[in-house]
């Protein structure tokens, strides 16, 4: 079974070796057919602490690393230039 991969934006990097990634998902309302954006936050493992807030990253599902962390950062697609 292939591992799940998804892309999102880093919204927090305050924890050591952990980032919080917000993943947006566009869905259509069943009754009204309006396109809505649902956002889900995932905690992901960042071994080298190389991500900053605003980066676009790819995360991959892995074994549970802690109570809330079961994703790992694969690569950084684009860096944030706010700093």
Curated annotation (Swiss-Prot):
Pfam families, per database record: Ribosomal_S17
The record's section on PANTHER family has: 40S RIBOSOMAL PROTEIN S11 FAMILY MEMBER, SMALL RIBOSOMAL SUBUNIT PROTEIN US17M
Q: Which InterPro entries did the record assign?
A: NA-bd_OB-fold, Ribosomal_uS17, Ribosomal_uS17_bact/chlr, Ribosomal_uS17_CS
Gene Ontology CC annotation, any one = chloroplast
| Location (main, coarse) | plastid
Instruction: Name the Gene3D superfamilies for this protein.
Output: Nucleic acid-binding proteins
Q: How does it assemble?
A: Part of the 30S ribosomal subunit.
Q: Where in the cell is it found?
A: Plastid, Chloroplast
* Protein name per Swiss-Prot or TrEMBL: Small ribosomal subunit protein uS17c
Q: Which domain of life is it from?
A: Eukaryota
Q: Which CDD domains match?
A: Ribosomal_uS17
GO MF, one term, reads: structural constituent of ribosome
Q: Gene for this protein?
A: rps17
Which family does the record assign? Answer: Belongs to the universal ribosomal protein uS17 family.
Instruction: Work out whether the entry's keyword set contains rRNA-binding.
Output: yes
Its biological purpose is as follows:
One of the primary rRNA binding proteins, it binds specifically to the 5'-end of 16S ribosomal RNA.
Q: Which keywords does this chain's UniProt record carry? A: Chloroplast, Plastid, Ribonucleoprotein, Ribosomal protein, RNA-binding, rRNA-binding
Is the Zinc keyword given for this protein? no
Any one Gene Ontology BP term: translation
